[in-house]
Amino acid sequence: MGLTSSLRFHRQNNKTFLGIFMILVLSCIPGRTNLCSNHSVSTPKELPSSNPSDIRSSLVSLDLEGYISFDDVHNVAKDFGNRYQLPPLAILHPRSVFDISSMMKHIVHLGSTSNLTVAARGHGHSLQGQALAHQGVVIKMESLRSPDIRIYKGKQPYVDVSGGEIWINILRETLKYGLSPKSWTDYLHLTVGGTLSNAGISGQAFKHGPQINNVYQLEIVTGKGEVVTCSEKRNSELFFSVLGGLGQFGIITRARISLEPAPHMVKWIRVLYSDFSAFSRDQEYLISKEKTFDYVEGFVIINRTDLLNNWRSSFSPNDSTQASRFKSDGKTLYCLEVVKYFNPEEASSMDQETGKLLSELNYIPSTLFSSEVPYIEFLDRVHIAERKLRAKGLWEVPHPWLNLLIPKSSIYQFATEVFNNILTSNNNGPILIYPVNQSKWKKHTSLITPNEDIFYLVAFLPSAVPNSSGKNDLEYLLKQNQRVMNFCAAANLNVKQYLPHYETQKEWKSHFGKRWETFAQRKQAYDPLAILAPGQRIFQKTTGKLSPIQLAKSKATGSPQRYHYASILPKPRTV
């Protein structure tokens, strides 16, 4: 596909030409629909030069309900990965969907005269600069929290929320009605738009699919500035493109999320295995059953001293004497973590159900620990750990995380090499591992997964300790990640990255496989100038190649278009 580079747009002062230009621009950018404002989109009479001060002036001239700032850009120049420093030119604080649409249409109108790109930023929890827009515009999506969270009861209850709302607020509000979303991430202080642009996977995904599986409707601002309402039956291509689409096709401004009755309590259970085959077999057994736990995850523990004694602060052992005799030093262990939801009046039957399920498993008997906690406390468990790390100054540090999706057929070979040879400890962060059943997932989203019904999420979640050396050093952890990836490639394990990050077109094409052409075609349809989500490093904005008038001409003549891919993007500057 490609953008023809032979045509170049030259600015002219002739008023007649400007009139024709405006007609063509407006004809190739459909008008907005379902906006939360009655304002019309203001368009500059002249295109500003590429000079940053002229670009700033053009942004200031926009008629917005919110506002644009230029002074605090360093606050959004980093993300949770904390490895890159890429300040934008400006920050948009939108008060309405109209503000986002106006900004997008303005940048489309500028065409090849500017380098402006746009990144929608929620809580900034991307890992490798995906939510950054170097010298572009960052949209602070948390400013877009109006109208309020709206909950609808009935046979199929749902909640309407802003794309900038965070999941913990949705949980708190829906619980007032005895309801809750079905599928979660492990950390709830993330925005709706952020998780739906990736997938949103946690221990409920085997039963309900990821969060993108539980969306009825979306409102999207596309890369052209169009505001589109979409669902499985209405504008379905855009709907499925955006879900798991890495922010490439549009900005999620509203979402309608499926709900279910919420429990009051959970029984939270942990058990240990020393044999990976037994561990993975039991995990797969649990996710295959109709009547099973409501949450199934697991994690790897390598050479951890006094492990079970550390659990006692939150969990109670089934057999305290036997638990005290268990030694974890020097061992590679696998923890199965499961949860059963219940209400107080169901406690007795819940105990019977969990007892029966546990009796069918092959864990080490002395390692059974459990706890009963409120539903919201369990779901918000990572935030409790966050507060402790913040107090120690260990939250805002580099996070060289690696998230992989591994086919069932490859998981044993992966575990044998990685957990026994490549890794010697995991004291600097957890390693999650659990299977999901893909047969219950929607098939048409942009999310890329292995081509097997059952695959495992394996997440390496280390933190690089500041001013450290050895195994806690950032460079060491990055090299360790690369060793894992090199092994996967050499062994041909057919692994896919979750929250992917690649540097070259070849790598992105390999990631998408046979779906690459569809992905690129949808990019052309919804964001033809490649304005959105530059930090993903998939496409580069077509600066100096095509303006809207040339784009319209190329469509009219059927001229081929060419995108510029990640292979020619400049390397981000490290912090």
From Swiss-Prot:
InterPro entries: Cytok_DH_C_sf (IPR016170), Cytokinin_DH_FAD/cytokin-bd (IPR015345), FAD-bd_PCMH (IPR016166), FAD-bd_PCMH-like_sf (IPR036318), FAD-bd_PCMH_sub1 (IPR016167), FAD-bd_PCMH_sub2 (IPR016169), FAD-linked_Oxase-like_C (IPR016164), FAD-linked_Oxidoreductases_BP (IPR050432). Its EC number is 1.5.99.12. Residues 84-262 form the FAD-binding PCMH-type domain. It is an enzyme of class 1 (oxidoreductase). GO terms for molecular function: cytokinin dehydrogenase activity; FAD binding. Keywords: FAD, Flavoprotein, Glycoprotein, Oxidoreductase, Signal, Vacuole. It catalyses: N(6)-dimethylallyladenine + A + H2O = 3-methyl-2-butenal + adenine + AH2. One of its GO terms (cellular component) is vacuole. Expressed in shoot apexes, lateral shoot meristems, growing tissues of young flowers, and weakly at the root-hypocotyl junction. Belongs to the oxygen-dependent FAD-linked oxidoreductase family. The enzymatic activity is significantly greater under acidic conditions in vitro. This is Cytokinin dehydrogenase 1. It comes from Arabidopsis thaliana (Mouse-ear cress).
